[in-house]
Swiss-Prot record:
Native species: Bradyrhizobium sp. (strain ORS 278)
Localization: Cytoplasm
Family according to the record: Belongs to the UreD family.
Molecular function per GO: nickel cation binding
Keyword Cytoplasm belongs to the record: yes
Function description: Required for maturation of urease via the functional incorporation of the urease nickel metallocenter.
Main localization, broad class: cytoplasm
Protein name, per record: Urease accessory protein UreD 1
Subunit structure as annotated in this protein's UniProt entry: UreD, UreF and UreG form a complex that acts as a GTP-hydrolysis-dependent molecular chaperone, activating the urease apoprotein by helping to assemble the nickel containing metallocenter of UreC. The UreE protein probably delivers the nickel.
Cellular component, GO annotation: cytoplasm
Gene name linked to the record: ureD1
Length: 278
């Protein structure tokens, strides 16, 4: 009996896809945040650099060297009562062109009472024809706090690449005290470069970013606005439902990163990861 060529090709494709998962939780012991129940699998790893002054630092490493179509990665972090952690990435994450099957990335963050999570990865760069579905689920206790940022760059701007085809789906859900306080799904597909050129979407920007600050209110927004220098790109801030949000867009990752760092510096006393400052 001869094997079905289409089925054989699908099996080969699946066998060559990267898989990776990291799960760990944190506990406050004798006033020090310590990791607990660490699990790693596949090509996703986590490293814990030298202790920072405030809580624990964790850095994710994708040993596959990037994300391609059909890859699947998952990150789960639970911060126990009173613990503090800053989560970052070793480098900008590259998402390569995909023939059809999108990559999948699932992130779940949980923080108990009085715990704090800073989610501060470096930017994600989508190559032309890249396809990725990302899901971010955040569950905070009423007295927990969060500082989160994400930067996405469409196309390799340094070499003049334009994203003429691709798919980007980004689903965020934020719960606080068991209540859903923020839900958003961003979907861009087809000629993404053409869509970003439209004035009502990004007005030609190729890098976009979002920062979430919990808790946050109008007073925090005004304090950030008064302290900020002139932005290199465009930025907007608002607050509702007990959290503050900043949106960014710029012509390149460096400009957006500078604007993001300025906002994060005003919004929180939590130091940025050292890799952000290199």
């Amino acid at each position: 009996m001869r094997a079905d060529p289409a089925s054989a090709a699908a099996d080969i494709f699946e066998a060559n896809r990267a898989r990776g998962a990291v799960r760990f939780d944190l506990r406050l012991q004798d006033g020090v945040t310590r990791r607990h129940h660490l699990h790693e699998s596949g090509s996703l790893r986590v490293r814990f650099p030298s202790p920072e002054d405030d809580g624990l630092s964790a850095m994710f490493v994708n040993t596959a060297g990037g994300i391609a179509g059909g890859d699947r990665f998952a990150i789960e972090v639970a911060a126990g009562e009173g613990s503090r952690v800053t989560l970052s990435s070793a480098a900008a994450e590259k998402v390569y062109r995909a023939p059809g099957t999108p990559a999948e990335l699932a992130i779940a963050l949980r923080a108990a009472d009085s715990a704090h999570i800073s989610w501060l990865p470096q930017e994600t760069i989508l190559f032309d024809r890249a396809r990725i579905h990302r899901r971010m689920d955040i569950d905070l206790a009423e007295t927990a706090s969060l500082l989160l940022c994400e930067i996405v760059v469409f196309g390799r701007t340094a070499m003049g690449e334009r994203m003429r085809e691709g798919e980007f789906v980004d689903r965020w859900r934020l719960r606080r005290g068991g209540k859903l306080v923020f839900a958003e799904t961003v979907r861009l597909d087809g000629d993404i470069g053409d869509k970003l050129a439209q004035p009502a979407i990004a007005n030609g920007a190729t890098a976009i970013g979002t920062a979430l600050i919990v808790p946050g209110d109008g007073a925090l927004v005004e304090r950030i606005r008064e302290s900020l220098p002139a932005s290199r790109g465009e930025a907007g801030l608002s607050a509702w439902n007990g959290f503050a949000m900043a949106r960014f867009c710029a012509q390149d990752a460096a400009s957006l990163r500078a604007d993001m760092m300025a906002v994060l510096g005003c919004a929180s006393a939590v130091p940025l990861p050292r890799l952000w400052l290199n």
